A protein has these predicted regions:
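N-terminal Rossmann-like or analogous alpha/beta NTP/dinucleotide-binding catalytic cores
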Residues: 1-125
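Active-site cores that bind ATP or allylic diphosphates and position pyrophosphate for catalysis
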Residues: 103-242
Length: 242
């Protein structure tokens, strides 16, 4: 759980938010606040409470309509955690040990805990409990959807056809958003652009975005222009051609 920035919601905010906004009128859409997942990195209950509130406000401010979307808090659905346990007794250790996200998070300084190690199992329960068919994720979360499919298939093989096998929806463009310094946008690099930052801060950050040495009037290469890469995230094809 974190305030919206151009990069992140768990992995990528745009990766979840844009598809959710676009799909909410055509599909049965479920969005949840992952407060149990957040416990792997947040221990202060007051901080967690504020993050939950902020995340809900972010969803609503960006265009999520509660009349079209089922928006809920993970901890309010006890069945998710029951299912997580049922899946855990079927999950081979080797399956979890192969998950690169655990190793990445440990390398970034998070404590090596069972909760962090078994994160993919709770994520599988999140997905399977609502019978999701499409799951918007980043490339770094694709493996977790594959774990979900493996666990669902194993459960179905033992107990019958209970769970639907979900498919990941991956936006390749969003997985590599450039930060204001030209590197991959990341809070650890301190190069993010917060959606709800003040105009003054946004103005300063935008002016710091790394560009080439060409004059404003010169023709730019859209594939290597950082400004255009950000513009593409919030524009349609016609606007990009213009």
């Amino acid at each position: 759980i974190a305030r919206l920035q151009l990069l992140h919601f768990s992995t990528h905010h745009l990766l979840l938010m844009k598809p959710a906004i676009e799909m909410q009128k055509e599909y049965e859409t479920f969005l949840f606040i992952a407060d149990y997942h957040a416990l792997t990195s947040v221990n202060d209950p007051n901080i967690l409470k504020n993050l939950i509130r902020d995340a809900v406000l972010d969803f609503l401010a960006c265009g999520i309509n509660p009349e079209n979307v089922c928006l809920y808090k993970q901890s309010d659905v006890p069945q998710v955690h029951e299912l997580s346990w049922f899946l855990s007794v079927l999950a081979p250790m080797g399956l979890l040990e192969r998950c690169h996200s655990y190793k990445d998070k440990i390398a970034k300084g998070l404590d090596s805990t069972h909760g962090l190690f078994s994160y993919p199992i709770l994520m599988a329960a999140d997905i399977l409990s609502i019978e999701a068919s499409i799951v918007p994720v980043g490339k770094d979360q694709k493996q977790h959807v594959e774990v979900t499919r493996d666990l669902a298939a194993k459960f179905n093989n033992i107990f019958g056809e209970v769970f639907r096998l979900p498919n990941p929806l991956i936006n390749d463009r969003v997985s590599s958003i450039p930060g204001i310094d030209g590197q991959k946008m990341s809070k650890s690099y301190n190069n993010v652009i917060g959606i709800f930052e003040s105009n003054e801060i946004l103005d300063k950050k935008v002016k710091k975005i790394v560009t080439d040495s060409k004059n404003i009037e010169d023709k730019k290469d859209p594939d290597s222009c950082n400004i255009f890469s950000l513009f593409k995230l919030f524009s349609n094809t016609d606007e990009q051609k213009e």
